A protein has these predicted regions:
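Short linear motifs at secondary-structure transitions and domain/linker junctions
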Residues: 35-38, 105-109, 162-164
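Bilobed periplasmic-binding protein-like "clamshell/Venus-flytrap" ligand-binding domains
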Residues: 1-15, 61-64, 106-142
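Extracytoplasmic/secreted proteins, especially bacterial periplasmic and envelope-associated proteins
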Residues: 19-33, 48, 52, 57, ...
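Ligand/substrate-recognition segments at binding pockets and active sites
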Residues: 1-67
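Short, solvent-exposed loop/beta-turn-alpha elements that line the ligand-binding surface or hinge
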Residues: 1-3, 51-56, 74-104, 133-170
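A glycine-rich, aromatic-flanked flexible loop/lid motif
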Residues: 64-69, 88-91
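Composition- and surface-driven signal marking solvent-exposed, interaction-prone regions
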Residues: 22-24, 43, 76, 113-118, ...
């Protein structure tokens, strides 16, 4: 048989405030029922975690990253990208080619299609498990701002200040 334990390092400053910390703690409790010990280590020293990742000694880790509205996947997933070389170790010529094709185009619809293919490949590699999608909350006072002029579809990638020139103040 294989190992019946694994450590997952969480980059939450040792305070349990990383969004994945609670989910991993609950998963650890559930896995104990079937005899697997998932050790959740909330790292107070981020350098200790990145050193383990870079050395290839981390079983698993939970960190967060965000992308721009038109993300460039090179740094995270390309074979020669900075994060991939130390975190994922993906060496996939098809993935590399798709990433480079996307980098060479300014057509966002085309890039979106390529990025979808890239993410399908990454999912097949099973090197990461999406745990959450961050959402921001923005509050405006109707006494101070004409709400009809606020960006209608605010996302984490397109915020109200991207259309600040359209805002009417009361």
């Amino acid at each position: 048989g294989g190992r019946m334990d694994a450590e997952v390092m969480v980059g939450g400053s040792g305070k349990g405030d990383h969004p994945s910390f609670m989910a991993l703690t609950l998963a650890s409790d559930a896995l104990k029922e079937i005899g697997f010990n998932l050790i959740v280590s909330d790292m107070s020293n981020f350098a200790e975690m990145t050193n383990a990742i870079n050395a290839g000694t981390a079983d698993m880790f939970a960190m967060a990253w965000q992308a721009t509205p038109d993300p460039d996947m090179f740094q995270i997933y390309h074979s020669q990208g900075g994060s991939n070389e130390k975190s994922y170790w993906i060496k996939d010529a098809d993935l590399d080619e798709l990433i480079m094709m996307a980098r060479q185009s300014t057509d966002q619809t085309y890039r979106k299609t390529l990025y979808k293919q890239c993410l399908d490949i990454v999912a097949d590699w099973a090197v990461e498990i999406p745990i959450y999608q961050r959402q921001n909350c923005v509050i405006f006072s109707a006494k101070r701002v004409n709400l009809d002029t606020v960006t209608p579809d605010i996302t984490t990638y397109w915020t109200w200040y991207n259309d600040i020139e359209l805002l009417d103040l009361q």
